[in-house]
Amino acid sequence: MQKRSSFDSAEIMHRAEDLMQAASNRYRITVQVAQRAKRRRYEEFDAVEDPLMKPPIRAIIEMSDELTQPEIIGE
């Protein structure tokens, strides 16, 4: 039995590419994605929304959304 994921791997790759192109330093953006994934993993340890979507994938999606839609960042 094959599990169906709720995301498209090609879309994830495209979003990751967009993040890399927008960043001035590839290493720094990679570290930022990793830090966000780690933080989200511990923040939502008990509340599991989508067990198929791993924290790094969720971090890439969130960061690319923030890049393309700056109005979603509310401070």
UniProtKB/Swiss-Prot annotation:
GO biological process, one term: DNA-templated transcription
EC number: 2.7.7.6
Record-linked InterPro entries: DNA-dir_RNA_pol_omega (IPR003716), Pol_omega/Rpo6/RPB6 (IPR006110), RPB6/omega-like_sf (IPR036161)
GO molecular function, one term: DNA-directed RNA polymerase activity
Keywords linked to the UniProt accession: DNA-directed RNA polymerase, Nucleotidyltransferase, Transcription, Transferase
Gene Ontology cellular component annotations, sorted alphabetically: DNA-directed RNA polymerase complex
One Pfam family linked to the record: RNA_pol_Rpb6
UniProt catalytic activity: RNA(n) + a ribonucleoside 5'-triphosphate = RNA(n+1) + diphosphate
Highest taxon of the lineage: Bacteria
Function field: Promotes RNA polymerase assembly. Latches the N- and C-terminal regions of the beta' subunit thereby facilitating its interaction with the beta and alpha subunits.
Subunit-level organization: In cyanobacteria the RNAP catalytic core is composed of 2 alpha, 1 beta, 1 beta', 1 gamma and 1 omega subunit. When a sigma factor is associated with the core the holoenzyme is formed, which can initiate transcription.
Family indicated by similarity: Belongs to the RNA polymerase subunit omega family.
Protein name according to UniProt: DNA-directed RNA polymerase subunit omega
Species: Picosynechococcus sp. (strain ATCC 27264 / PCC 7002 / PR-6) (Agmenellum quadruplicatum)
Taxonomic placement: Bacteria, Bacillati, Cyanobacteriota, Cyanophyceae, Oscillatoriophycideae
Gene (name only): rpoZ
